[in-house]
Amino acid sequence: MKILVTGAAGFIGSHLCEELLKDKKHNVIGIDDFIGPTPFSLKLKNLKNLLPEKRFTFIKENLLTADLASLLEGVDVIFHLAAIPGVRSSWGNHFHPYAAHNIQALQRLLEACREHSIQTFVFASTSSVYGEKQGKVSENTSLSPLSPYGVTKLTGEKLCHVYKQSFGIPIVILRFFTVYGPRQRPDMAFHRLIKQHLQQKPLTIFGDGQQSRDFTYISDCVKGITAVLGKPHLIGETVNIGGAERASVLKVVSLIEDISGRKATLHFSDKIAGEPSNTWADISKAKQLLHYDPATSLKDGLTNEIAYLSSLYQGE
């Protein structure tokens, strides 16, 4: 099976490529243009295990300008993870790249799929499409994104649906809930807090720290993504990919202190515009359709991320 992963040098994309290559029948093409909040050096490090693989081909190109007809030649499955991520930086003058890469690039890819016989097109969406909600959210919950980023991802979902309805593009939408673990982006909360703690700096808490998230460990997330393979009955479905545990930011800080054996100093700052107070995934559908069973505890997952970042920032 020939599989295309967009955003292959990213946090989730690089882990996904590695998991796909465990199956000797898979040949993986990864495309990435090294844009977004993650530095070039870290994205290159993400690819370290992949580049020597004979069944992996890496292409450094932008989906807005790439020759998609050539790229999609013989491709069976597409995992479209490439996007400009993050709520904070999607406001104001920073919005243009979000619109270009999260909407226009997706539309180009969907349009190109009209000329190719793709088995499955998996679109990576986000819990940000739900907005401010109380309690668990199922896939049928009303969608009210709070940020320009969330709006671009919801627009992406709508594009996927119209291309399925009009041209039969076999889309599956997965909504990720706060994925964490080794290789997590530097702008994400866990990475930022752990780095500050390792460097013995005050930990910046946006808001009062009581906001909570459904945290999904990277290996659990990737298992959910790859479970889509070989399931044609999933075409047209939207599925939440959540974690084994949810917690407040202050609870996460407490776990970081426990794991590191050192107390943290906290610096409280203004709440981020566009961030919901809570997220909580109802993963009943994922369990039913994907046999999805996230098993990594928050403490175990944080321990792994701390070990990774300790190695990454050693000597700084």
UniProtKB/Swiss-Prot annotation:
Q: Which residues bind substrate?
A: 126
Q: Report the top EC class in one word.
A: lyase
Superkingdom as given in the UniProt entry: Bacteria
Q: Cite the InterPro entries for this sequence.
A: Epimerase_deHydtase, NAD(P)-bd_dom_sf
Residues crossing the lipid bilayer are none
Pfam families the UniProt entry points to: Epimerase
- Which PANTHER family does the record associate with it? DTDP-D-GLUCOSE 4,6-DEHYDRATASE-RELATED
**Designated name of the protein:** Uncharacterized UDP-glucose epimerase YtcB
